[in-house]
Structures are given as structure tokens and as C-alpha cells.
Amino acid sequence: MVKIVFWDNCLNERGTTTTLFNYAYYNKTILGNESIIMYNTSRTDNINEVIDLFKKEFKVIGVNNFKLVDTILHKLKCDIFYITKAGENEGQISKVCKTVVHCVFHCNQPHGNVYAGISQFIKGDKKRVPIVPYMINLPEYNKNMREELNIPEDAVVYGRYGGYDAFDINYVHKIVYDVAKQNPKIYFIFMNTQQFCGSLPNIIHIEKTIDVNRKVEFINTCDAMLHARHIGESFGLAIAEFSTKNKPIITTPNFKLNPKVDIAHIHFLKEKGIWYNESNLYNILTTFITEENKEEISKKDWNAFKDYTPEKVINQFKKVFID
């Protein structure tokens, strides 16, 4: 049995924490190894409910200074220290055990014993680094929020969740407001999303959740996901979660706004993506899904992430980080 300490700078609702939980959980349940969680207690963006969720499954250790990490790793007789990073070598590695670095945004500064990326589409010299992708494992759950939110069953609903400030393309904000104002039977629901326009009854904001059933309930409420992140995605966990629940993803390649955009969402979705720009978004939101074609749209295959199951990904995790 291998003992792995998983480090996260903070434990919150973001995708990096979600994926760290998944790696640690399936390292324990599928691979039969020991998973221990360590995090920085001084971060103000830690969320107590998330920390409690980790404590139900793992031993959790908080430290207020990274310099304390090696002393704890030595005492624990740890075999591997796993850490997620943007990609920079900022000095956060262990000197007492094998350090495996998992890069989220780029892979330009190799360091540690293993240096890997989250997708083959992140920036940097990807030919030199192995890839361990995110895994998608939302539960089967059939409820939705339409009754709770007073949304008619025949209404068209677009939604998104993700980083609070990551729905940030200005022209999308304006078009969403215009569509909602002129089409009262088209709804937009936003979870954990910064408010960006005036109030309308069919633009609904919902607080973040760490309950995966609640997350699926939110996805089930939507007919499609509307994605609008100006820097693109180096993987796109929220996109993947909507996609595995067979929801169309309405998004943009976005090269005009940002020539250095991350392009993972473009490569993953391919022909399954519904691609917008400023000139066609209004038309897409008002004609792509209608009351008349909703059922037909829902029967099509929109899942672009069939290969990212826990069983497949954790074996890649083992191959790259453990073996």
C-alpha cells in the first residue's frame, strides 16, 4: 500500500478541490492506497463545509506555513506528495519524499519527481510531460429545480456554474439580458455566478453548493449550458459535467477577444459544441432549443467526455504518479 498526501492550497468549491477529492477517494477505494489531505489554513477562501466533507473520508491536516509540510510528511512516513499547481516552480516541493506536480494552466517549468498536465491542450511543451486528466463522476439523480424556482416545464432553460467570476464575456452579459427581456419563456439560471445585469424574473441566481446531488439537480433543470469564460479552459470541469449529463454546451472559441485563449474546450467538444460569437449568439439562444424541439434535442448524443470515468482516469493516475 502506498501512502499519498494530497496538498491543496485551499479547500473550497472550485474544480481543483473537487478533482483532488476524486483522486484521493479513488486512490483509496480503487487502488487500495492510503490518502491523506493537507491544506493551507491561512487562506481566506477555505470553506468549512468543504473541509468537513473531506474529513468524512480522509485524515485532514491543516498547516499555516508550507515550511511545516516536510516535518509532517517525514513523521507520516509518506511515500508520495501530490500537489496541484498552475505550473510554476515556486518552491513548493518535498525534500523527504517523491513529489508529483499536476499542472492546471501550463507545463513550462518542469520540477519535482513527476511533472504532469491535466490535459493535452494546456500551454507548454506537452510532448515532454505525461497527462492525467480530470475524472467526471456525477451521480445518477433524477430531480430538477423547476418547481422550486417556479420555472414552467415547457420553458427553455440555459444555465451555468463554475468560478464566481468566470462568466465574464461582456457581450454575452448584454445578449443574455436582451434575450430574457424579450422572451419571457426563456430562462437563465446561474449558480455561483457574479450578477452582471439588471433583475428580471427569468434570470435567476443561485448560491454555490458542495452537494453533488444538488449540482446534478441544477444540471437537470437546464436544457443546455451557456459557457462564457474569456480565457477559455485548460480542461473545463463544469463543461465536462454538463456534457456527461447529455446537455449541449453553448460556448465560443473566443480567439478575437483573447488570442492566447486556452483551447481544451474546443478540442474536447468538437462537433458536439454549439459555437457562438457576438453576431450569432442572440439567434442561437432564441432558436437552437424551442418548446417544439426540446425533446428531439435531448435525445441526441452530446456527451464528449465518455472516456473520463473514475476507473479509467485513476489507472492513468497510477501509471504516471505512482508506478
Question: What is the predicted function of each stretch?
Answer:
Residues 134-199, 205, 212:
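Conserved catalytic-core segment of nucleotide-activated headgroup transferases in glycan assembly
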Residues 216, 239-244, 258:
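Short alpha-helical segment that forms part of, or immediately flanks, the ligand-binding pocket
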Residues 248-258:
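Short hydrophobic beta-strand element within catalytic cores of glycosyltransferases
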